[in-house]
Amino acid sequence: MHIIGLLAVLIALPILGILGAWFGLDAAGIDSLRQQMQTVLPGYLVTSGWLALMVTLGVALVGGTVAVAISLFEFRGKRFFSWALLLPMAMPAYVCAYAYTDFLQYAGIVQGTLRGWFPGFRFDVRGLPGAIFLFVFTLYPYAYLLARNALSERGTHLMEAARMLGTPLRERIVRVALPLARPALMAGAALALMETLADYGVSAYFGLTTFTTGIYKAWMVLDDRIAAAQYASALLLFVAVLLWLERREQQRMRFSSVRGHRGDDGGAEARLPVLGGGRAVLAWLVCGLPVLLGFVLPVLILLQLWWGELGRTAQTGFEGGSASLFSFSRYAGWVWNSFRFGGMAALVAIVLALSLCFAQRAGGMSRVSGWLLRGVARLASMGYAIPGSVIAVGILLPVAWLQAVWPAASLGILLTATSLGVIYAYLVRFTAVAVQSVEAGYTRIPASVDEAARTLGSSRGAIAWRLHVPLLWRSLATAALMVFVDVVKELPATLLLRPFDTDTLAVIAHNLARDERLGEAALPALSIVAVGLVPVLVVMRALDTRKN
């Protein structure tokens, strides 16, 4: 019970810190807010709104199209595309931004060729359209994966029934497949939208005026804590609305699954239409372009940048000069910091997740304890949707207030001069990932196992440690892996809370790209992609296992 109470305080503190800043408004703060509403806030609202709207539509369109192609048709190469379409999940949008900025620069081969064909032609990828493009082609796998599962479970039989009734193919897709996949597409688009709102790397690198860049600028540049809290609370409100909408769509998905499951078991396996000739080529293009634009091309660009930088470094000596950041010792330090943060956060997250899930399973609590437990579970599930910059500000605001009231505590130094603050932010944001994995593992352990252990005289601690942990080791390993990878890729919380002179792969890649040193940023960026590939491979294997 003590762990549950501690977890409730830890998760709720950043949210309460942001909301509590509104109670500290004085006349100067109100005047500052009025000025912001007349100057910067409209720009934040317009840019963030357009980005959210277009990314949502783009992710639903691309994810839904490839899900229909993979789930409802047979064509040569389908098995390859079914897992290759997940590869962009390993590519953070800010890493993709570094690659395309170099590839599409004014002096590059692409714009040079286009200007040769069309004199006077020019464009700049570092703008709102470029950001929308990057987010769509790195985040569409969320919608693709959920829509593919929905269509594979229920769509094939309904499409076959519509075909036997003489419905044309186009009408079958529009009137059967798309309505069936709509809740899944909405849920996937909501997840992609949360990732978009939480992004700092793309917005900062492209110079966009979004809420995340506004939070960072208000805190780090203007030293305006009240403004940072106001921006963070506005973003938090938007995320809460998104969570409510996403939960509604998830309920509709479960309702559809219950209704459609009964009819799927009885009949023979439905025959999928086989595509050949021009239709097969079209299917290859539809499925191949997202993989090419969201993963293959950025990786090739980064490899070319790294190879070029490696050649230039070799001419002056691998350790030559203080300007060269490609020394092995520095790179090893960035990797060590990333893995150290990821390992510590993953270890604590699985302990908290196991404690929370075991308490929910064991029951036997008072009414107040049960209410607290449900509240903690709801807060933990909300944590992943909260942007890292919002969590960082929510941590720093109470710390700054406590430091002013109680200077001898040195709490600010403890959180910002050590790894404690950044690990805390990771736990608030990513404990939800561990909880979901452990909950899924507990569904495979019958309650009768616990009853038998209690009959034999085992205590709660013995049941959890000696019985559940061995049975849950796969789920615990998956939870640790997911948290570890998310920590390695996390940028805004790390930028705000990391100890002085402690750079991770994400931070150093951002700093080098910001200084237009893209060749030097390529190796850290590729390392992040390589780490991100691990959970994607796990998902691919799980899908193949379930299919078989």
Regions found by a protein language model. Give the residues of each.
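The alpha-helix within a helix-turn-helix
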Residues: 162-163, 453
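Short glycine/proline-centered loop/turn elements that form peptide/ligand docking sites
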Residues: 154-157, 445-449
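Membrane-water interface segments at the C-terminal ends of transmembrane alpha-helices
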Residues: 1-26, 39-152, 180-200, 228-247, ...
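Peri-membrane helix termini and adjoining interfacial loops of integral membrane proteins
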Residues: 21-33, 105-117, 206-212, 254-265, ...
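Feature of multi-pass inner-membrane transport and sensor proteins
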Residues: 155-156, 171, 202, 208-213, ...
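Internal catalytic domains of large membrane-associated glycosyltransferases
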Residues: 141, 159-161, 171
